[in-house]
């Protein structure tokens, strides 16, 4: 930063946006191939490309922010605005799923038997695994807040413990959600109920996996002393994202599991 006369980060040319776009193309094309032809070659290639891109892109950002000092207060302010806009876009993404659900459930057509859940669908009991999942995510929201406060106070041990607890709760939620999918009496192809249920809860599960990965990276960085009480936006962004995942699940639980059953 000594050779600059301003506080802004002039990003160097990077191949990762291009490889990220390529991995997204391979992932979506691979999903189509998997769904229609039961072939996982393209999907596996997309996952591998995506993982490699994430690793190397995160590596570059950590190098720029932690070791090269490019993330000045002005740059961090821009990153915060970017993260807020990203979460807002995710809100509208899930709003589409809720719209589809309520559009179909509030005025069920004759094809659905004139009722909701549709005739022939046995919904999951909202007081069993879904309620446990809700408790797990709410507990993880408490632990991530504990981790944030510990970081602000400079308490490394509590920060490490709270962050590890949050990650374990996220993994536990993912396992419970996967086991629930195997126990359902309906599938994604069982009309509008199956489609909206698995699309909404499945994409939320994907966001939990993404958030857990985000937190694992933060834990590894915390163990390497990358975060301080005044310079920790990477963790702060992960915490915001995790709270967003918590809130979305509460709406999913109330709408699809409880009211929709």
UniProtKB/Swiss-Prot annotation:
Stretches assigned to the Mitochondrial intermembrane side = 35-40, 106-128, 184-190, 257-261
- Cited Pfam families: COX3
List the stretches on the Mitochondrial matrix face of the membrane. 2-15, 67-72, 153-155, 224-232
- EC number(s) of the enzyme? 7.1.1.9
What molecular functions are annotated in GO for this chain? Answer: cytochrome-c oxidase activity
Q: Return the InterPro entries for the record.
A: Cyt_c/ubiquinol_Oxase_su3, Cyt_c_oxase_su3_dom, Cyt_c_oxidase-like_su3, Cyt_c_oxidase_su3-like_sf, Cyt_c_oxidase_su3_a-hlx
Q: Gene3D superfamilies attached here?
A: 1.10.287.70, Cytochrome c oxidase, subunit III, four-helix bundle
Compartment annotation? Mitochondrion inner membrane
Q: List the catalytic activities from the record.
A: 4 Fe(II)-[cytochrome c] + O2 + 8 H(+)(in) = 4 Fe(III)-[cytochrome c] + 2 H2O + 4 H(+)(out)
Q: Among its keywords, does the record have Oxidoreductase?
A: no
Q: Which GO terms describe its cellular component?
A: mitochondrial inner membrane; mitochondrial membrane; mitochondrion; respiratory chain complex IV
Write out the transmembrane intervals.
16-34, 41-66, 73-105, 129-152, 156-183, 191-223, 233-256
Keyword Calcium found? no
Its job: Component of the cytochrome c oxidase, the last enzyme in the mitochondrial electron transport chain which drives oxidative phosphorylation. The respiratory chain contains 3 multisubunit complexes succinate dehydrogenase (complex II, CII), ubiquinol-cytochrome c oxidoreductase (cytochrome b-c1 complex, complex III, CIII) and cytochrome c oxidase (complex IV, CIV), that cooperate to transfer electrons derived from NADH and succinate to molecular oxygen, creating an electrochemical gradient over the inner membrane that drives transmembrane transport and the ATP synthase.
Question: Quaternary structure per UniProt?
Answer: Component of the cytochrome c oxidase (complex IV, CIV), a multisubunit enzyme composed of 14 subunits. The complex is composed of a catalytic core of 3 subunits MT-CO1, MT-CO2 and MT-CO3, encoded in the mitochondrial DNA, and 11 supernumerary subunits COX4I, COX5A, COX5B, COX6A, COX6B, COX6C, COX7A, COX7B, COX7C, COX8 and NDUFA4, which are encoded in the nuclear genome.
Which family does the similarity line name?
A: Belongs to the cytochrome c oxidase subunit 3 family.
Q: What is this protein called?
A: Cytochrome c oxidase subunit 3
Encoding gene per record: Mt-co3
